[in-house]
A protein has these predicted regions:
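Conserved ABC ATPase signature
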Residues: 131-138
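Q-loop/switch helix immediately C-terminal to the Walker
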Residues: 86, 91-106
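Catalytic Walker B motif of ABC-type/P-loop ATPase nucleotide-binding domains
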Residues: 156-160
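Conserved ABC ATPase "signature" region
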Residues: 100, 112-127
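Hydrophobic anchor residue at the start of the ABC signature
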Residues: 145, 184
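Helix-to-loop junction immediately C-terminal to a conserved catalytic motif
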Residues: 48
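Conserved ABC transporter NBD signature motif
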Residues: 56-68, 76
Length: 215
């Protein structure tokens, strides 16, 4: 379980948002809402250990994620995946190579066929062997989402995953996220639009809103 307890973030001697607390369990999806500039990205980065909090704490399965608990930090790193505005793809590699390379540096064995299936799910199999530098922003995002789908992460933390996608890709993403949650995964995401996650002919995933309020 992920627990966020009274987290605050200060920029220029002023808090970005009021202290925020929530928890996220297996099989749940949380939608982090808030006005532009309120600090949604900053909060996600704090949760993922990419930026420090100015107050409060983040816990994973009851253990605080800080320097005094390196084992808890390592366990959290192994079980979560963050996708921000910077997709962290390598432009000199092809789409399929990006998936295989990411698995390799993470110490995971990703079969070529499984990587190709992930690209096909996101409609990228026809561009699997093209270098990222020639792809559109939407195609790069679909590649990143395909990469996400083959991680072993239980917790997905996604910052605006629905931007730069066409209607067909949005439908594929909704199914991907619904599958993850319904199979016991955890999802925390931001979006400026109303979102529904469901499988074809399946039950919609309950999405719990968390609103970030300016301090």
């Amino acid at each position: 379980m992920l627990t966020v307890s009274s987290i605050t973030c200060v920029r220029g001697h002023k808090p970005l948002f009021a202290p925020v607390s929530f928890s996220l369990q297996a099989g749940q999806a949380l939608h982090l809402e808030g006005d532009n500039g309120v600090g949604k990205t900053s909060l996600l980065r704090i949760i993922c250990g990419l930026s420090p909090a100015d107050a409060g704490e983040v816990l994973w399965n009851g253990s605080p994620l800080n320097r005094q608990n390196p084992e808890a930090v390592d366990a959290f790193r192994a079980t979560h995946c963050y996708m921000g505005h910077n997709l962290s793809l390598k432009d000199e590699l092809t789409a399929i190579e990006n998936l295989l390379f990411d698995a390799q540096i993470a110490g995971r064995n990703l079969p070529y066929d499984k990587a190709m299936d992930a690209l096909q799910t996101m409609g990228m199999h026809h561009r699997a062997h093209l270098p990222l530098r020639v792809l559109s922003q939407g195609q790069k995002r679909r590649t990143a989402l395909a990469r996400l789908s083959v991680t072993e992460a239980k917790l997905w933390v996604l910052d605006e995953p629905f931007v730069a996608l066409d209607t067909q890709s949005l439908d594929k993403l909704r199914v991907l996220l619904a599958n993850h949650v319904q199979q016991g995964g955890m999802l925390l995401f931001t979006s400026h639009q109303a979102v529904e996650l469901s499988q074809p002919k399946g039950h919609a995933v309950d999405i719990h809103p968390i609103r970030l309020v300016a301090a």
